[in-house]
Amino acid sequence: MKKTTLLGLILGWIAFPALAQNKIEFREFTLDNGLHVIMHQDNTTPIVVTSVLYHVGSKNENPERTGFAHFFEHLMFEGSENIDRGQYMNIIQSRGGTLNAFTSNDITYYYELLPSNELELALYMESERMLHSKVDITGVETQREVVKEEKRQRVDNQPYGSILTETLVRAYSVHPYQWAPIGSLDHLNAATIEEFQQFYKDFYVPNNATLTIAGDIDYAQTENLVIKYFDEIPKRRKEI
């Protein structure tokens, strides 16, 4: 026992400097509207990742309107008041970038990977998503079909495709984890445009989001850009 304890102490002492060296340095601040911002500077490669995490997932949904959080993951690429419909991806990709998003029980997450000289573009695009996204009949009807096809591919036409749904409903009898993020297509079909618009107003707000910027950046310049594009976005007054 003593030898084992001594060996553990020696290994811990050896590993500690390595862990200390791998510590990731970052800076963070919060805007007056509640947006939490985390920045990490790494100038080894001329790229930057910009991401926004919204604290909304399937657990936040009305049990009669499941699938909203995942649906919005798609809808938020429809464009905004200042970005033409369907052009969000084209703009990022035309600048040499990639982008994607995902939804879980707890969060909805969007990101762009771009050359570092396009950081301002990424921040502008995410601010448009947060403040001016198009939530209208055209976008909703378009994305309904996209989500239907996704469900067919990933769930309906897959061996054991329903195993997650069946497991969750048996594991959680009361907790909102009882339904999968894909939700119910019947609920999405029954929802009104006003319900979609209210979901956007409730959850796509700065005080329900964390903005993360990592890569080839300058801290002071990046903070100024964040303030430029996000500081005037109003917070949600109602508690989330």
PLM regions and their residue ranges:
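N-terminal signal peptide c-region/cleavage motif recognized by signal peptidases
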Residues: 15-17
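M16/MPP (pitrilysin/insulinase) zinc-metallopeptidase core fold and M16-derived inactive scaffolds
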Residues: 49-112, 178-182
